[in-house]
Amino acid sequence: MKIAILSRDGTLYSCKRLVEAAEQRGHSIEVIDPLSCYMNINPAAPTIHYRGRQLERYDAVIPRIGSAMTFYGTAVLRQFELLGSYPLNESVAITRARDKLRSLQLLARQGIDLPITGFAHSPDDTGDLIELVGGAPLVVKLVEGTQGIGVVLAETRQAAESVIDAFRGLNAHILVQEYIREAQGSDVRCLVVGSKVVAAIERQAKPGEFRSNLHRGGTARKVSITAKERAIAVKAATTLGLDVAGVDILRAARGPLVMEVNASPGLEGVESTTGLDIAGRMIEYIEQRGRPGFRLKSGG
């Protein structure tokens, strides 16, 4: 198969592992910077150009699109979809997952358990918003944030009001969520490929920090998950239309809660912690699904 990876940096661990896994299976694979692509949106003969050359059709495309380039990156991915390339995560699914508010609403519609979450526009509603999620301590999140950026733990009501006002002063869209104290700064990252959880790790925040992201100094260990956690992870990924996803689960006293669904999960932490070949599982999935005649779930 002829495969493209959409990524700004082919030297990143995840990209290098995907290239390695594809080449080991005899596939041709190329890393393409989506910001260097430009398109002819023509119903008769659509094309994609890259650094002065017209790209030929690829059998499959693996999007590794960072949050900062979601708009243009998914536009490029849609053009590949238009040309008939199989996307490992469709453009529509990625945009759903990148919008934290929309994704939580979709998950809630399917009855998936979540931390209690509030969203409001008017400063006049701040007091009620804080009460809706059970009061302080609580978590304030930027809707557009990733890797723990724009996530603040407010331990008192006064701190919560100050943080919310500060974000509003920047015209930022924010979510207010209950703080799951019993999780003690840890979460479970489930790596979903297709309809299976292929790996799971527990991430623990560093001392003095509540965000467990590995990019923020958190640590990881291999962990066994329950049947309920496995089912909720697969259901969350399926609800957003993602073939590959990192589903982050908080172990609360009332049961597992989906905190976030990541459409472009990093492979380094999961592979190094578990010793599993996740990149290989992703390429195998492409081999199974990326055949001529496939249909987009969403219509593109």
Curated annotation (Swiss-Prot):
GO MF: ATP binding; metal ion binding; ribosomal S6-glutamic acid ligase activity
InterPro entries in alphabetical order: ATP-grasp (IPR011761), ATP-grasp_RimK-type (IPR013651), ATP_grasp_subdomain_1 (IPR013815), RimK (IPR023533), Rimk_N (IPR041107), Rp_bS6_RimK/Lys_biosynth_LsyX (IPR004666)
* The ATP-grasp domain, residue ranges: 104-287
Q: How is the cofactor bound?
A: Binds 2 magnesium or manganese ions per subunit.
Q: Which residues bind Mg(2+) 1?
A: D248, E260
Q: Does the keyword rRNA processing apply?
A: no
Binding annotation for Mn(2+) 1: D248, E260
The UniProt record gives the binding positions of ATP as K141, E178, Y179, D187, R211, S212, N213
Return the SUPFAM superfamilies for the record: Glutathione synthetase ATP-binding domain-like (SSF56059)
What's this protein's family per the entry?
Belongs to the RimK family.
This protein's name: Probable alpha-L-glutamate ligase
What is the species of this protein?
Serratia proteamaculans (strain 568)
